Regions:
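Thiamine diphosphate
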Residues: 1-174, 178, 339-354, ...
Length: 354
């Protein structure tokens, strides 16, 4: 098999993003990267490492602390024929660019009667740990799911991170590309060649017949581990990664729910008015056996993101609580069953700062 098509190698999530960016920039001169610290030696957790030395500062543009201006430059240049990749190292501070994202990027194609395209990607990094607390740990993907004209994608695996970024850069619409810091060192098999992971197509990561578990972003890793714990209790969980949140593949989820009769949605965000609420609503509207389906949602506790490790452990859903909730949902009541789940060997706590 030619080297360019190798599929058996294992690389990290961050390396997959870096590789996709490098290959796209080499293939298409209209692709460029801009953001705060994109040329830093640490390379935004390794995702932009060595890009500046390879492509120059005209295509890897370090920007000042001005999120609104950064995003405005991206939206304007995309309308002029470029394909910018904006890097916002903290999703929290994308709030400073909401006018550019919502009133300009998302609406220009419609407002100009289809004459204008806005092919820009906004890499928005979310996460937790290292005591980042209220203003540096928020997951705000649900905000952007509410806006017509924006696409939202949140890949979990290195394979899907590379393919989803390629699809996002090639798309003619603005895309919010959500990535979790604690996934950056997550390893998986990734082909060397360029390929696309399409929007609106979920991936079944584990098949099962007793319960459907849908996990978003980093929560998916915990869901897989929870499914293994449930298997030890003779419960077969089907685990689905939506990957694309807007548009979302409701058909794959509904087909699974009609088979299992139980649905647990685990969001990497707050549950009120969030992605889990949207998924549950879509299932209610589309599933054929509503009266026989039991559903439950899990997500962040509905309080401000905490700083201390003790509170973080209570705040974020983990595999133990996911398995316990899934088991009790199937049984139709609270039980005394306790899952046997070991500490995650796949994910490292983020140790900061960049």
């Amino acid at each position: 098999m030619p080297k360019s098509n190798r599929r058996d190698r294992s690389i990290t999530y961050a390396s997959a993003i870096n590789e996709a960016t490098r290959q796209l920039m080499a293939q298409d001169d209209s692709v460029f990267v801009l953001g705060i610290g994109v040329d830093d030696p640490r390379g935004i957790y390794g995702t932009t490492s060595n890009l500046s030395s390879e492509f120059g500062q005209d295509r890897v543009v370090n920007m000042p602390l001005a999120e609104d201006a950064i995003t405005g430059i991206a939206s304007g240049s995309s309308m002029a024929g470029m394909r910018p990749i904006v890097v916002h190292e903290r999703m929290d501070f994308m709030l400073l660019a909401m006018n550019q994202l919502i009133n300009v990027a998302a609406k220009s194609h419609y407002m100009y009667g289809g004459a204008v395209k806005v092919p820009m990607v906004v890499r928005s990094i979310i996460g937790r740990s290292w005591g980042q607390g209220a203003q540096h740990s928020q997951a705000l993907h649900s905000f952007f799911m509410h806006i017509p004209g924006l696409k939202v994608i949140a890949p979990t695996t290195p394979h899907d991170a590379k393919g989803a970024l390629v699809a996002s850069v090639r798309d003619d619409n603005p895309v919010i590309f959500v990535e979790h810091r604690m996934l950056h060192n997550y390893k998986g098999q990734v082909p060397e060649n360029l390929y696309e992971v399409p929007f609106g197509k979920a991936r079944v990561l584990r098949t099962g017949g007793d319960i459907t578990i849908v996990g978003i972003s980093h929560a998916m890793v915990e869901c897989i581990r929870a499914a293994k714990s449930l298997a030890a209790a003779s419960i077969s969980a089907e685990v689905i990664d939506p990957i694309s949140l807007s548009p979302i593949d409701v058909q794959t989820i509904c087909e699974s729910v009609e088979k299992t009769g139980n649905l647990l949605i685990v969001d990497n965000g707050w549950t009120p008015c969030g992605a889990s609420a949207e998924i549950m609503s879509l299932v209610i509207e589309n599933v054929q056996r509503q009266d026989k389906v039991k559903m439950k949602r899990m997500g962040f506790e509905f309080v401000t993101s905490p700083t201390s490790k003790i509170l973080e452990d209570l705040y974020y859903p983990d595999s133990r609580r996911i398995a316990k909730n899934a088991y009790d949902l199937i049984m139709g009541k609270k039980t005394d069953w306790e899952p046997d789940v070991q500490e995650s060997p796949e994910i490292d706590e983020f140790k900061g700062p960049f």
